[in-house]
């Protein structure tokens, strides 16, 4: 997938909301809205990334001749009331950046595309950086109805949850996206295009962000699509990474096998001397392929495909490989993807100082590593067996590292799977309350697979308490998840 349109972001490294930045106030960075703005009686304009568009594109819009119907409307403008003029002025201040208008999107679509680029692109991955793959979808969306309508459906649905309003728009765009996607599958020339994959991935996100299990139907289609085409040279590394994230999460949580085709994709990650963090997952770029291996070991254990001694032997070897992905405290991390050998210097576009974001990114990557250690340990040991000293150390270290990622801003948005894995080991009430407080912060993002994660973990705790009292048999959290009818991507 080509990326002909670069999408740079306006600078805001101070961590303040845009209103505090404008008025030069000390922002408290509270989510979802800054309390300082409320104290000053103004509406907080949020922390979202704002796009700065190339002057040559803006100039094209200015040079475009004005359509005739604008002249017919000019007389009616003079009859508008002062209140309507004021309202119009306010609307203009909130308008989509000029490049979107230049691409002729209607007002409603412009609004939701802005929301997708500024907000969803920021919270739907671990590290929002200048190479954010969600924003690189813009040129494709402007040219392809399937991608455009799928992105608008995701944005409209998310916006309604974020603002706690009725969602009476997203289904319209969802229907249009599905219709356009169906037409692509009918046409052999379009069926195997990366555009088709991007559209299906956005439909997965629509369902996952809504907390629905319907994402599985879309992902089954993606699996068939990948197996039915030859090669992946024309696929963008971000799309490939996106597929790997869903595939790995599905396998880890549901006890299914990962796609063997994806192992080759994830083998492109640079060696760990570069200390590269995967911007989509939030972990070391070498860890996703090991998480995939862990899911296969879990399947082998669950289906009794190998004996217990062999399971423990393979688990020990996998633990060593996971340990090798450790990021030293003083490492200068880079940002990359598991499906490419390219990486870039650490950069930040989120409202946070660069060093602070780097510390959070490193802590998040290490939390993923420790959670993976515990996950693999539980493959070879029963759900209520005491943790080994090494696994207990991983649990305690991960809980300490969570305090370095104090909220859902930036890398903290991607910790749902880790919270479930770590939380499933906790019995102390104060520790459980802390984990629930982390869920509450993540719910503010409006991505409701976090609510699935919390309900799964609460049921796991109920089961642990019953087991401790002698009223139930031990159960893995994955089995609890399926017993209560949950099947979700937790990252």
Identify the role of each PLM range:
Residues 1-191, 210-418, 422-491:
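Intrinsically disordered, low-complexity activation-like regions
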């Amino acid at each position: 997938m080509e990326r002909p349109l670069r999408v740079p972001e306006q600078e805001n490294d101070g961590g303040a909301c845009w209103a505090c930045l404008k008025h030069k106030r000390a922002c408290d960075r509270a989510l979802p809205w800054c309390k300082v703005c409320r104290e000053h009686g103004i509406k907080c304009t949020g922390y979202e990334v704002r796009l700065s568009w190339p002057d040559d594109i803006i100039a094209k819009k200015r040079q475009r001749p004005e359509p005739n119907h604008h002249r017919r409307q000019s007389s009616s403008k003079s009859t508008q009331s002062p209140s309507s003029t004021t309202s119009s002025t306010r609307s203009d201040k909130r308008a989509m950046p000029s490049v979107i208008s230049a691409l002729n999107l209607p007002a409603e679509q412009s609004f939701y595309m802005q929301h997708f680029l500024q907000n969803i692109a920021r919270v739907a991955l671990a590290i929002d950086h200048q190479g954010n793959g969600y924003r690189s979808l813009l040129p494709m969306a402007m040219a392809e109805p399937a991608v455009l309508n799928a992105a608008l459906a995701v944005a409209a649905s998310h916006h309604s949850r974020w603002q706690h309003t009725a969602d009476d728009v997203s289904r319209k765009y969802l229907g249009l996206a599905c219709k356009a996607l169906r037409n692509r599958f009918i046409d052999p020339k379009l069926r195997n295009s990366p555009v088709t994959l991007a559209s299906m991935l956005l439909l997965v996100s629509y369902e996952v962000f809504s907390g629905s299990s319907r994402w599985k139907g879309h992902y089954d289609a993606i699996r068939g699509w990948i197996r039915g085409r030859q090669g992946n040279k024309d696929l963008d590394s971000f799309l490939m990474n996106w597929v790997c994230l869903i595939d790995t999460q599905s396998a880890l949580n549901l006890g299914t096998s990962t796609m063997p085709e994806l192992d080759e994709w994830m083998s492109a990650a640079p060696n760990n001397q570069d200390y590269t963090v995967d911007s989509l997952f939030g972990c070391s770029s070498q860890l996703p392929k090991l998480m995939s291996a862990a899911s296969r070991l879990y399947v082998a254990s669950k289906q009794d495909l190998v004996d217990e001694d062999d399971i423990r032997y393979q688990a020990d070897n996998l633990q060593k490989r996971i340990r090798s992905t450790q990021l030293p405290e003083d490492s200068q991390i880079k940002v990359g993807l598991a499906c490419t050998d390219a990486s870039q210097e650490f950069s930040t576009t989120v409202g946070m100082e660069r060093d602070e974001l780097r510390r959070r990114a490193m802590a998040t990557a290490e939390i993923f590593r420790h959670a993976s250690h515990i996950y693999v340990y539980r493959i070879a040991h029963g759900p209520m067996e005491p943790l080994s000293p090494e696994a207990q150390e991983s649990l305690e270290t991960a809980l300490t590292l969570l305090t370095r990622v104090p909220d859902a801003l930036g890398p903290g948005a991607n910790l749902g799977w880790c919270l479930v894995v770590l939380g499933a080991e906790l019995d102390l009430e104060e520790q459980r309350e802390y984990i629930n407080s982390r869920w509450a912060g993540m719910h503010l993002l409006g991505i409701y697979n976090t609510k699935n994660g919390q309900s799964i973990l609460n049921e796991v705790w109920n089961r642990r308490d019953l087991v401790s009292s002698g009223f139930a048999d031990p159960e893995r959290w994955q089995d609890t998840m399926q017993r209560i009818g949950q099947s979700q991507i937790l990252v």
